[in-house]
Each structure stands twice: as structure tokens, then as C-alpha cells.
């Protein structure tokens, strides 16, 4: 299962455009939709990315794969998986807060996002300062 760059770009633009249109309609009070419905394009896009990532990670389990050539690659894929799950947790917490399902403090809603940004900053610093290939 492989997507070309043009397909990935088109898919990203399509889901982003759909999400932004739905968000504008909700914020202008033209559509009385639930916040969970507004985020459906984001979740569909994330699901596609998660499936592609899991398929790539499962490909490492096939016979004939040489584990000496890619231990760094599996760590990167694991980080991508954790990042996607943190983004999903943030979106779910944000929707729950906006729908007033919970009386959670707003700073608790942003904990997954802060963890995601801290991890991204750590990976960026590691790639800039320590990886010299």
C-alpha cells in the first residue's frame, strides 16, 4: 500500500479544506453540528495515516528483513505512531471540552498537545545537533 506524493498532497488538501469549511460553518452558527462531527475529516485523515504507518511497521516483521539496517527507522516510526495518538487524544479532549461533556480545566485539555510539541522539539534538536550522516 503506497501512495504517491501527488496523492498524499491532494488528500491532505481535500481533508483540510473540508475541515475548514465545516469549522467556518460551525463558528458562524450556520450549522448546528456537534463538534465531533466537525472533526470527522481530521479523524479520517489520521486514520488513513495510522493505517499506512502500521502497515509499514508490520512490514518489518516479514521474513527476510535484515534488522541491522533500520533500527533507527523503527524508532522514528514508533515516534510517528505516538505523535498521531497524542494528536488524537488532543482532538478528543478538545471536542469533549467544546461540547461541555466534562468540566475539565482547559490546561488539562492541552496536555497531549504540549507533550506532542515537546517531543517534536526534542526530535528536531536531536536531528539538528546529533545526527551527522
UniProtKB/Swiss-Prot annotation:
InterPro entries: TM_Fragile-X-F-assoc (IPR019396)
Cell location: Membrane
Disulfides per UniProt: none
Membrane topology: Multi-pass membrane protein
Record keywords, A-Z: Membrane, Transmembrane, Transmembrane helix
One Gene Ontology cellular component: membrane
Chain ranges passing through the membrane: 5-25, 35-55, 78-98, 110-130
Signal sequence range: none
UniProt protein name: Transmembrane protein 60
Amino acid at each position: 500500500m503506497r501512495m504517491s506524493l501527488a496523492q498524499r498532497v491532494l488528500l491532505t488538501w481535500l481533508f483540510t479544506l473540508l475541515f475548514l469549511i465545516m469549522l467556518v460553518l460551525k463558528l458562524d452558527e450556520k450549522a448546528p453540528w456537534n463538534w465531533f462531527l466537525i472533526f470527522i475529516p481530521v479523524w479520517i485523515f489520521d486514520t488513513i495515516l495510522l493505517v499506512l504507518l502500521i502497515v509499514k511497521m508490520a512490514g518489518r516483521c516479514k521474513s527476510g528483513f535484515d534488522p541491522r539496517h533500520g533500527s533507527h527507522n523503527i524508532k522514528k516510526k514508533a515516534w510517528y505512531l505516538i505523535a498521531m495518538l497524542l494528536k488524537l487524544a488532543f482532538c478528543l479532549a478538545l471536542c469533549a471540552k467544546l461540547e461541555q461533556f466534562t468540566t475539565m480545566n482547559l490546561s488539562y485539555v492541552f496536555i497531549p498537545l504540549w507533550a506532542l510539541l515537546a517531543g517534536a522539539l526534542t526530535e528536531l534538536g536531536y536531528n539538528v545537533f546529533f545526527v551527522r550522516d
